[in-house]
A protein has these predicted regions:
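A short beta-loop-alpha structural element at the N-terminal edge
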Residues: 8-23, 34
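Conserved GNAT-fold acetyl-CoA-binding loop/helix
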Residues: 26-53
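A short helix-loop-beta-strand connector motif used in the catalytic cores of GNAT acetyltransferases and
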Residues: 50-66
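Conserved beta-hairpin
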Residues: 62-76, 81
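A short, internal acetyl-CoA/4′-phosphopantetheine-binding micro-motif in the GNAT/acyltransferase core
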Residues: 69, 89-97
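Conserved acetyl-CoA-binding loop-helix of GNAT-fold acetyltransferases
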Residues: 97-110
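Conserved GNAT acetyl-CoA-binding A-motif
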Residues: 112-127
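Conserved catalytic-core motifs of GNAT/GCN5-like acyltransferases
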Residues: 121-125, 135, 140-156
Length: 162
């Protein structure tokens, strides 16, 4: 069975999964993006995935995470701040292009709508490397790109289907 044919399970992650999820996100970032970023941008990213910072937010329900697993191996992570802000979305490069990120995002939206069925919109500050992906998911830019720590971000929104 090829990597593409393996079944992928999407499930909510909790505090017990946080360290593994953040380590996974760092490993993907380090392999795919860090080389193109300056030291300030890498440090900024590391602060975003700091265990203590994230643990507090998971503990109080502000940060929610989902994982994609293939044969019990973590191959993708999605995190939302609150119900509608995409915080992280990272997929193992070997599993990219197989719909894993799309499935993670859809599950996160589904779970968010279970908490608030009137969810008005989703927001993402998409880095330059992810604008195309989010555009394909129906997100539209709501402003001009802005630069922070050498990385260009575009705020994008999506109005979920009822």
């Amino acid at each position: 069975m090829s990597e593409h044919e393996r079944p992928v399970e999407i499930r909510a992650l909790g505090m017990d999964d946080l360290e593994q999820a953040l380590q996974f996100v760092w490993e993907v970032y380090a392999r795919t993006e860090a080389h193109a970023r300056d030291d300030e941008a890498v440090q900024d990213f590391l602060s975003k995935i700091d265990f203590e910072y994230c643990a507090v937010r998971v503990g109080d329900g502000q940060l929610r995470l989902w994982g994609a697993f293939s044969e019990e191996k973590l191959i993708g992570v999605c995190a939302f701040l609150g119900l509608n802000r995409v915080y992280l979305l990272y997929v193992d490069p070997r599993a990219q292009g197989q719909g894993v990120a799309t499935r993670l995002l859809k599950r996160a939206v589904f779970d968010s709508k279970r908490h608030d069925d009137t969810l008005p919109r989703l927001i993402v500050e998409a880095p330059d490397t992810a604008v195309g992906f989010f555009g394909k998911q129906g997100f539209v830019p709501v402003g001009e790109p802005t630069e922070d720590c050498g990385v260009w971000y575009t705020v994008m929104e999506l109005t979920p289907e009822p």
